[in-house]
């Protein structure tokens, strides 16, 4: 428990001993033990002190032994130093002998290498005099290696310096000798063609010798290339007629002869890894590139440069580059010769106008409609136009080497836009029948109009891809986009005009007869036994053939106008969108003719004025119209079935959209007819029916017009009674001041003009009581700054049709098929 250390902490033992209250009972015993232990320790200390006093001699003995240890250590050091000196004296002679051995070995090696160098030099000298390059390769390589790597550091020695000078002269003589042989070869002296021995001597001998020194080899290659191209450089000087731009093609032809001659006669005399043909072509490129820059700069100093000459030179250069690229698999790294023409490429782009003018002459003379009915229903000239564009674009990108050149790309974009606009004006727009010419043959007019739409769509969507392609190489995409903006708008306008023509001038030719039958029908005596005659005619007019071979053959002679138009569209998206618009036109016509049939004849509320139809008759008419709507719904549901022969047609999103659109229109018509038939016996019941069918429509003009169409007499008391029930649930908003965009016009949204006429006539009632009711209760006032004049029905329909002009964004999808017609 008690520790014999100076760091002893008594608190730990005290804590352990007195860890509980019970331990206090033994406190006396603990104190007694502690005192006894303390006494024992004091006795031990005294005993140790006494022993130290009794034996002081032990310290002296320890000191003496330490002195003895240090003395022995000093003696050992002295012996060690003496031994080391003795050993050094013994090995000194051995070190001298080792150094002498190394020097002797090095001297022997040096003299051996010197002998080899001398022998190689002598041997090379003899072989050179004999012209034996192949045998000379091995000693020559040894000689060059030793001279450059071993003895160059001993050049200060006269003998070595003399030998190295002799070797240098030998190298020069070797190069001269090799040049003599190649000169004789190129000049066609007494050397026989395809001399095998000479071939081996030059290729495996002379070329191997030249490979020993990079600078010598480069010098020799340049000398050979200069020899091979000497005549060409002399003939085609830029200051001579032969070297002019007019004779550029002759320069290329001449070089081809040089290249072919080299490959057939001289290529075997050089090592393959030298690639002499590639070097020869690269040197020609370098020379011609410099000459071309001079010639083109000189040509365009003139205010009237020859564009034909420029184009001829450019075309011959492009043809030559293609030839070289094919021959050498694009190994030529020298800048292309066509890059010299790049600063003047805007002239090249403008020169393409001549080509396009010729193209347009052929476009205007060829048949507008494809001769083969199975062909894509676009003008063949449009596909040819974009093939031409693609060719021009490809050539331009080759000329600028696929690098960004905004000025050229902008010129190209303007070129494309210009001729696309010309194409729309000269080729496409004439396909559209002018407004001042009556449609004589609706199928013929429809055929060419759909051809216009298909082609304009092809052009419009392809313009986007053309713009994207140009943008890939341009640093100014916005500027390129601006170049195409006007063109895109022109084609969008063409699409809108073509679609509007079909909807407003072709389709109505059939529908007008239907609505004439509607007007001529004896509505006062509606029998309500079968569908009305006008509706049967409408079904016949809109009849769509089933998509089977047999039925198509049956319908080929006289298809319905709608069926013919849908069959001519090049893409299903146009068919679906066109059906959407036709459904809206029929719905609008149905509403307009129903309103005209039932609307009161002004002036209103005159004494003794009678309504066209009594309320009871209007109910009978409504019942007949409900029956007719059943057939109209059937007709609308039949239309989408003929768009495509796809087995999954009913799962098609467009099919579902068109069918849902038709159902929504029919539902609106049903609510309108049911409202016309709603009884007026109870004002509250009528209000409940009205609110349910019009979705709580708050517009007082709509409420008034519906009452007027129901044939209710001009009995102010009856009108106020019905109004009181209606007015309790509506707010006090001034309907006359509410903007049309915020008004819920119910069924009259399809013919706002008729609603406006009714409001105008109602607000101008002369009877003071009626006038007060209209202005204060109904809050209807004449339209401000606007005069609405009643027009004959046919003229009114034409005004409605003009409203059908479509935005191309509502009718055209943005799919792309740039590669069509390729």
From Swiss-Prot:
Record keywords, A-Z = Coiled coil, Endosome, Golgi apparatus, Membrane, Protein transport, Transport
Q: What is its main location?
A: Golgi
UniProt xrefs under InterPro entries: Vps53, Vps53_C, Vps53_C_sf, Vps53_N
Which cysteines does the record link by disulfide bonds?
none
Can you say where in the cell this protein is located?
Golgi apparatus, trans-Golgi network membrane; Endosome membrane
Which residue stretches, if any, does this entry annotate as coiled coil?
Answer: 34-58, 460-484
Q: Which family does it belong to?
A: Belongs to the VPS53 family.
Function (record text): Involved in retrograde transport from early and late endosomes to late Golgi by linking the vesicle through the t-SNARE TGL1 to the Golgi, leading to the membrane fusion between late Golgi and endosomal vesicles.
Q: Report the protein name in the record.
A: Vacuolar protein sorting-associated protein 53
List the source organism.
Answer: Saccharomyces cerevisiae (strain ATCC 204508 / S288c)
The protein's gene is named VPS53
């Amino acid at each position: 428990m008690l520790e014999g250390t100076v760091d002893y902490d008594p608190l730990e033992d005290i804590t352990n001993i007195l860890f509980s209250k019970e331990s206090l009972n033994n406190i006396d015993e603990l104190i007694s033990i502690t005192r006894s232990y303390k006494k024992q320790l004091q006795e031990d200390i005294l005993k140790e002190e006494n022993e130290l006093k009794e034996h002081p001699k032990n310290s002296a003995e320890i000191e003496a032994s330490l002195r003895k240890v240090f003395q022995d250590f000093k003696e050992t050091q002295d012996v060690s130093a003496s031994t080391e000196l003795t050993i050094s004296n013994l090995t000194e002679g051995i070190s001298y002998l080792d150094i002498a051995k190394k020097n002797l070995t090095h001297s022997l090696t040096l003299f051996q290498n010197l002998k080899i160098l001398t022998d190689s030099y002598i041997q090379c000298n003899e072989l050179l005099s004999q012209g034996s390059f192949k045998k000379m390769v091995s000693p020559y390589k040894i000689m060059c290696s030793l001279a450059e790597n071993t003895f160059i550091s001993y050049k200060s020695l006269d003998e070595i310096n003399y030998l190295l000078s002799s070797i240098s002269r030998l190298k020069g003589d070797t190069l001269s000798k090799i040049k003599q042989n190649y000169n004789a070869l190129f000049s066609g002296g007494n050397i026989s063609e395809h001399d095998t021995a000479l071939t081996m001597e030059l290729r495996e001998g002379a070329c191997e010798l030249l490979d020993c020194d990079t600078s010598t080899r480069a010098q020799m290659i340049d000398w050979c290339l200069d020899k091979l191209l000497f005549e060409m450089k002399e003939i085609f000087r830029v200051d001579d007629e032969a070297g002019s731009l007019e004779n550029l093609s002759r320069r290329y032809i001449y070089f081809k002869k040089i290249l072919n001659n080299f490959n057939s006669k001289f290529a075997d005399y050089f090592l393959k890894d030298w690639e002499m043909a590639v070097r020869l072509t690269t040197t020609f490129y370098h020379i011609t590139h410099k000459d071309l820059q001079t010639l083109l700069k000189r040509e365009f100093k003139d205010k009237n440069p020859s564009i034909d000459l420029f184009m001829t030179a450019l075309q011959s250069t492009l043809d030559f580059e293609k030839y070289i690229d094919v021959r050498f698999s694009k190994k030529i790294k020298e800048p292309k010769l066509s890059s010299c023409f790049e600063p003047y490429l805007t002239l090249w782009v403008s020169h393409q106008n001549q080509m396009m003018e010729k193209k347009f002459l052929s476009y205007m003379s060829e048949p507008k409609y494809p001769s083969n009915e199975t062909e894509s229903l676009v003008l063949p000239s449009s596909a040819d136009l974009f093939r031409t564009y693609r060719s021009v674009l490809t050539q331009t990108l080759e000329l600028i080497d696929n690098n960004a050149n905004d000025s050229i790309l902008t010129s190209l974009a303007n070129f494309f836009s210009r001729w696309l606009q010309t194409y729309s004006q000269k080729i496409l727009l004439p396909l559209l029948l002018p407004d001042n010419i009556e449609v004589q043959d609706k199928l013929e007019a429809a055929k060419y109009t759909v051809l216009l739409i298909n082609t304009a769509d092809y052009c419009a969507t392809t313009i986007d891809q053309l713009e994207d392609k140009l943008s890939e190489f341009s640093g100014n995409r916005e500027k390129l986009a601006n170049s195409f903006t006007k063109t895109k708008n022109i084609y969008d306008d063409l699409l809108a005009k073509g679609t509007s023509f079909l909807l407003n001038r072709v389709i109505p030719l059939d529908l007008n007869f239907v609505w004439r039958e509607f007007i001529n029908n004896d509505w006062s005596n509606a029998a309500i036994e079968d569908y009305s005659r006008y509706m049967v005619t409408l079904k016949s007019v809109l009849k769509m053939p089933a998509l089977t071979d047999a039925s198509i053959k049956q319908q080929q002679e006289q298809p319905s106008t709608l069926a013919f138009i849908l069959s001519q569209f090049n893409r299903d998206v146009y068919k679906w969108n066109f059906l959407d618009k036709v459904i809206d036109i029929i719905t609008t016509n149905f509403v307009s003719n129903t309103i005209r049939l039932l609307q009161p004849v002004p002036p209103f509320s005159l004494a003794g004025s009678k309504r066209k139809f009594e309320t009871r008759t209007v109910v009978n008419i409504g019942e007949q119209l409900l029956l007719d709507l059943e057939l109209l719904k059937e007709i609308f549901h039949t239309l989408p079935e003929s768009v495509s022969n796809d087995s999954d047609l009913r799962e098609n999103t467009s099919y579902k959209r068109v069918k849902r659109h038709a159902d929504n229109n029919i539902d609106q018509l049903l609510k309108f007819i049911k409202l016309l038939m709603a009884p007026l016996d109870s004002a509250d019941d009528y209000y409940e029916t009205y609110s349910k069918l019009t979705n709580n429509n708050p517009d007082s003009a709509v409420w008034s017009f519906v009452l007027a169409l129901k044939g209710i007499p001009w009995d102010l008391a009856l009108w106020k009674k019905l109004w009181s029930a209606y007015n309790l649930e509506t707010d006090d908003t001034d309907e006359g001041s509410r903007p049309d965009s915020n008004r819920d016009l119910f069924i009259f949204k399809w013919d706002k003009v008729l609603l406006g006429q009714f409001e105008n006539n109602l607000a101008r009632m002369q009877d003071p009581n009626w006038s007060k009711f209209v202005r204060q209760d109904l809050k209807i006032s004449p339209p401000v700054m606007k005069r609405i004049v009643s027009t004959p029905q046919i003229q009114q329909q034409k005004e409605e049709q003009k409203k059908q002009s479509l935005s191309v964004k509502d009718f055209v999808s943005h799919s792309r098929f740039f590669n069509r017609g390729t």
